[in-house]
Amino acid sequence: MNDLDSELMICYETMQNPETREKLALELSKEVASKERWKEIYDSKPLNNYEIGKTSYYLNRTSFSGKLVSAAWGYRPKRSLPPERWGERIIPCGKYLENTKLTNLDFAEIIRTEGKDVLLYVDPPYFLPPKHKHYRCGFDFRRSY
């Protein structure tokens, strides 16, 4: 699995590792989904990959439409899975990721990679959005390949 968004891929790596996956599920189960906590985490500066993964997961689950760029508070108590149940998603997802190669590369490198028994599903890259409203990593269509 590949994405140019390094924070997203660090989040997946955090879930992929059995030790950090368990820690992530446990710590997030004790979190509070509030606008104040969201703002505190949004403004934080994670110090290591584990903290980046944890922050990314929290913000994805509590931001409007899961957006992490120009994010806005979007958690809805009756519609959003509460933090105490996030482990129900983290644990199985991480187990699926255990045998998955995770990369943080430009898509042009990925599609040129040869391999046996490789499945490529290429989600078209997004054009550079105005002011990076939705995605951290846009696509410069003028770039030559």
What are these regions (language model features)?
Residues 127-145:
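SAM-dependent methyltransferase catalytic-core segment centered on the flexible catalytic loop
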Residues 9:
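Short alpha-helix immediately C-terminal to the canonical SAM-binding loop
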Residues 12:
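Conserved SAM-binding loop
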